[in-house]
Amino acid sequence: MKANSTKLSQLMKSVEIPFIKTEVPEIKVGDTIQLGLMVKEGSKTREQLCEGVVLARRRKKSLNTSLTLRCSFQGIGVERVFFLNSPRITFVKVIRRAKIRRAKLYYLRDLLGKAGRLKQIFN
């Protein structure tokens, strides 16, 4: 039974490899990133920029790698989940890195203004 599951996982990895993006920079929780997203409106497509703090990251090295990004849109906090290997994502750029001690930053949801700032790492 175990041999069949390993064969299946190897088969899944071989199918996923061509679809995994290689030009994505290393993104950690707490980073402030800028993300380009292709949005289709009617018959036209345009690129929408989204900038925010990464609250969570899931499945680091697979095709299903996703991250939760918290953006501020017109003074309201908006959280969106993005799949990094999606063809709709055109680019990802790390703007700022922060010193954090948590794996998930969900506590930032409750903080407002200066209380929600993270300590920046200067490298």
From Swiss-Prot:
Q: Which GO terms describe its biological process?
A: translation
InterPro entries, per the entry: Ribosomal_bL19, Ribosomal_bL19_CS, Ribosomal_bL19_sf, Translation_prot_SH3-like_sf
Gene Ontology MF annotations: structural constituent of ribosome
Where's it found, cell-wise?
Answer: Plastid, Chloroplast
- Location (main, coarse): plastid
Q: Which UniProt keywords apply?
A: Chloroplast, Plastid, Ribonucleoprotein, Ribosomal protein
* UniProt cross-references to Pfam families, sorted A to Z: Ribosomal_L19
Identify the GO cellular component terms for this protein: chloroplast; mitochondrial large ribosomal subunit
* NCBIfam families noted in UniProt: rplS_bact
Per the similarity annotation, which family is this? Belongs to the bacterial ribosomal protein bL19 family.
The protein depicted here goes by the name: Large ribosomal subunit protein bL19c
Supply the source organism's classification: Eukaryota, Rhodophyta, Bangiophyceae, Bangiales, Bangiaceae
